[in-house]
């Protein structure tokens, strides 16, 4: 059993769910943005920065980190600069929702 507030990363894969697609996070820096060549998860929207946010692995936990984007990353109605990703978390980037699950 995981202590409260800890993402269950050990032995499980983090999956980003976006527009019916699954994007496994399989590296230490997973880029979310508008840039097709520079992003692991591409959002085609001019309001999304080329390199909008990253998912990074730090001390055994995945974090979502805003990359000083123009429009930010929202969680539970408020903007976040960085946050530990927990199972089921739902983030908004402009008008787009990305949910993260561990499998």
Annotate the PLM regions.
Residues 68, 74-103:
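C-terminal boundary/linker segments immediately following FHA domains
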Residues 18, 58, 70, 75:
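Short, ordered coil/turn segments that flank beta-strands lining enzyme active or ligand-binding pockets
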Residues 1-46, 56, 96-102:
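Intrinsically disordered, low-complexity acidic Ser/Thr-rich regulatory segments
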